[in-house]
């Protein structure tokens, strides 16, 4: 019994020292603070559906100027227009008036023949992003920090 108690004490001490050795090293990297590209825009910009529909009439390599609401005007060129599936058409627009930010917007055909839209405008050199949201039948661009949005 005496040896069992000594072996138990040694095992507990060994586990304690091993567990202490497993602590993670301190993180010395901090996220890079980037300037904001869309800080002159409001937090939420209402977008009429007609403006979103007009974007999809433009062809690849064409220049585009479209007002997405009263506070957001897009100027740039269509760099890609791809039918991802038979129900989803996606476009990439390089926005020259927003330091070559990329506007990716998709039109999804619903089963009843109506359309829904999703999208985002992002620049990897800046710390914010505009996300296109649909809420209660109304579309809006919402400004968020880029840390909160996934960028491929």
For the regions a protein language model found, what residue spans apply to each?
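N-terminal signal peptide c-region/cleavage motif recognized by signal peptidases
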Residues: 16-18
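Long, terminal "pre-/pro-" and other extracytoplasmic accessory regions
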Residues: 5-6, 20-22
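N-terminal prosegments of processed precursors
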Residues: 21-152
